[in-house]
Amino acid sequence: MAIIDFKATKCRHCYKCVRNCEVKAIMVKDGRAEIMPDNCVLCGRCLQICPQSAKTLVSDLSMVKDMIEAGEKVVVSLAPSYMGLLKFHTIGQVRCALMRLGFADVRETSEGAALVTAEYAKLLSDGTMENIISTCCPSVNALIEKYCPQLIPYLAPVVSPMIAHGRMIKQQMGADTKVVFVGPCIAKKQEAQDPRHADCIDAVLNFNDINRWLNEEDIVIEDCEDTPFPQMDPRVNRLYPVTSGVISSVVATEVKRDSYRKFYVHGESNCIDLCQSMVRGEITGCFIEMNMCSGGCIKGPTVHDRSISRFKVKLDMEEQISREPVPAEETTPVLEQVSLNKVFFDRTPHDPIPSEAEIRQILAKTGKIRPDDELNCGACGYPTCREKAIAVYQRKAELDMCIPFMYEKSKSFANLVMETSPNVVMIVDEDMKLLEYSAVGEKYFGKTRAEALQMYLYEFIDPADFQWVFDTHQNIHGKKVHYPEFKLDTLQNIVLSLIHI
């Protein structure tokens, strides 16, 4: 099922999504951008930066409403980032507001994070892996499986907190329970559909979905009652959404000190740089927390208010967590063993690779015969002309995406018109300075193109009609004008262009 939907009619050939896609998982076909699911890692960057809003996220909201209306037992797994992204006085108000929407219960995903944290601590204690990469971020997992499969042995063989929590809830409340994850991540939607654990999460909503639904029902979170979360102590694992949150959680629960160096990386380009460094064998003996979103989950692609400071959110979350009371020992539930193991595998996209001769042939079609013809301007979305030529061969890109080539092509066409048109064509600016002058003008006005381009219109004909068009923004069509000094009768069309040259 599609995660991101493209509205073709809104796509305006700006190629901004192609430029910003770190893995170039967007193809352009018939001038319109399309996502290639096999190549996409669902970082959501294209969703954030599209200036035309041509990309929208497919929502599960109507499906969730149908579940509740059908009388299903529907439980929320609430990502801890809610503490920085929703407005409330106490966290219990959030639980109350969601239950008023019809959910049977609302639980925090940090419960599942506690199980994952324990597994990470075991891996660190065992010390058998050369490097350990956290596997909480499904976008990072997809990046490694698709583009750096050499690093799969470094991926912690552990499910994400969302999957762990889904299994926990269904174990406690029955297999027929519907679990809805609520968070800021779009890659979670694909993770929920993954055949490796497709029975754990039944739907995924983001906070925009929740806010829209609350508004529809006239529910204000700050006005709701404080209904505490009856669960195990999740406090330290609520830090997962912020940078270094996973590391902080693991360190806080370790029984004995391990020998791994620990650091975190966030942001698409930084994650790719690290992966390339690890492929080269430059990193060893490290536990690495990786998150594709710059700033962590609290800066996920569905967080529309980009002005939100991740630093302020982190401080707010830590303050909120510190105010939460430690649950009594007897409130901590005893769980049967929840399966947390996950197997990762190579999902490398198999794109055809052109020969050097084929690359040169494609480059030649856009006027790039010699290496110095390759401007590498990046306007098409690809960093080099060569990479763009490879994309053309792979049917990901089109020849006319090369803006310098299309400019030269249009200029050549314009020159051809100016040289061969049987009509006199003049282009002037608002000062009546001639910018273009067709070759046939010499026959009628006695001025060569070279001479005319050094002159103002009023130096050889009356510019009154041209000035009127500039002043009124009204065009003139089919006006008969006689020039006695040139013994010339004309039928004139004067058209205003608002393009500034």
Regions found by a protein language model. Give the residues of each.
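Sensory modules in modular signal-transduction proteins
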Residues: 409-445
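Iron-sulfur cluster-binding cysteine motifs and their immediate structural context
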Residues: 3-6, 12-36, 41, 45-61, ...
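Terminal or standalone catalytic/regulatory effector modules within metabolic enzymes
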Residues: 343, 354-406
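Terminal output helix/cap of sensory domains in signal transduction proteins
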Residues: 450-491
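Iron-sulfur-associated redox domains of electron-transfer enzymes in respiratory
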Residues: 58-360, 383-391
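Conserved small/polar residues in nucleotide/adenosyl-binding loops
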Residues: 499-501
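Short, intrinsically disordered, charge-biased short linear motifs at domain edges
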Residues: 1, 7-8, 26-28, 36-37, ...
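PAS-family sensory domains
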Residues: 14, 43, 445, 453, ...
